[in-house]
Amino acid sequence: MKVMIIAPYIYDDNIIEFTKNKTGFGIMVQNIVSSVAELENVVLLTRVITKGKNEKNFKILSHTWGQFFSNAKLKDWLIGIKAFFANGVTVKDKARHVFYEVDGGYVRKQIQKEKPDIVHIHGIGTITESYIRICEEMKVRYTVTLHGLIGLNDSVSAPAYEKQIERDFLIKAEKNNIPISVISSGMKARIEEKYLGKKANNITVITNGTKKSDENDTKFIREEGTLTQEKFQEYYSDCLKQNDLYPKLSDTYAYLQYSKKNGKKILFFVGNITKNKNQMQAVEILKNTKVFENILLVLWGREVDNGEVRKKIAEYQLHKNVILGGFNDRMDIFWKFCDVNLFLSLNDGFGLPIVEGYMHGVPCVTFEDLDATQDLYYPEAMLKVKDRSNESVTDTLKIALDKNWKYEEIIEIGNMFSIDKIGRASCRERVFWVVV
């Protein structure tokens, strides 16, 4: 079966044009593409301008400005012009929406050329609307995967029109039996309750997965004593004074190695730093240094919060307890330092960092009411926080740090969510919809 996977972008550190968007979504889609390509004939189409590339098992289709202009039809331009004059949109967004709609001509041409059995679209919004439009125009079978919900989450920063697109499409999809997959049971339940008011037979839960790298850490190991605790803390204090400046990964690695050796308990919190990911609450909790004197928290991810968390770390003088680590594409060699994976997101479809931690034997503390918790909760690997107060998080975290976790059991749970298993489930779902 030939599958055309369509996504706004992926993250791949080996291809320069795919390194701009350093997000969990980009990593997840790249993992899914690689996994499905082990089983099916896969081509990948994105919004990114690229010359394309033949990867080991799949092909990234070229997407150049020449292809953009030469394949656009009059109707694509007319729809683009209509999008430009939409209400409540900034000029920058207007230009972006015109690009998305006019780019429909390129998408049409690629579908004609590649002749996929099914098109698999990732995400709902203005950035993917023209993908759906072209599939329906050409009467090509398509399925859509949602990696999160924006319309039901006040903490997710998105324009009202984007949230309305999500709502309208999910209602349309249920009415027309368009196959949808979501990444957690909690997401499906909320769609049924808040959008549809009934059970949705067209929605399937296929949890996301991840893969564990065999990468070694040889290049990160340095001679003992070359970066003392005092030197790192002084160096990190200087980093805190400048926006988007982080310690080198090799220096953070050395400091974590030193801290672990000297009895520190280490927490990781993985995800771009945003209001929704809620790293600020973790910082507020660590402010109580009497309780967490021997704790080191590392926040891994890009800052998308205008430096608010950075300012709080400086204000509370927590440079000895909270490290802004920046985006880390070598996480696999860092997990061994982590005692507990802290995940305090306000809303999250799946909680990929939870699974990444599991695969390395790292237990998690997270909120009971997250969409992700229903599928990822195993008492051998997770403690659930009953409510969102700082006191409840503090109490649960203290229990987690004192608990005698069985790391091999946690790894076994993590292996249940390997990207290969998820890829096979995804392929079975596509085959079903193609046959139907």
Language-model segments: which ranges?
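Nucleotide-activated donor-binding/catalytic signature segment of Leloir-type glycosyltransferases, i.e.
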Residues: V309-N328
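Glycosyltransferase donor-sugar binding loop
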Residues: T210, V270-T274, I295-R310
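Conserved donor-binding/catalytic core segment of Leloir-type glycosyltransferases
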Residues: S181, R222-K277, L286
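N-terminal subdomain of nucleotide-sugar transferases
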Residues: M1-K53, K59
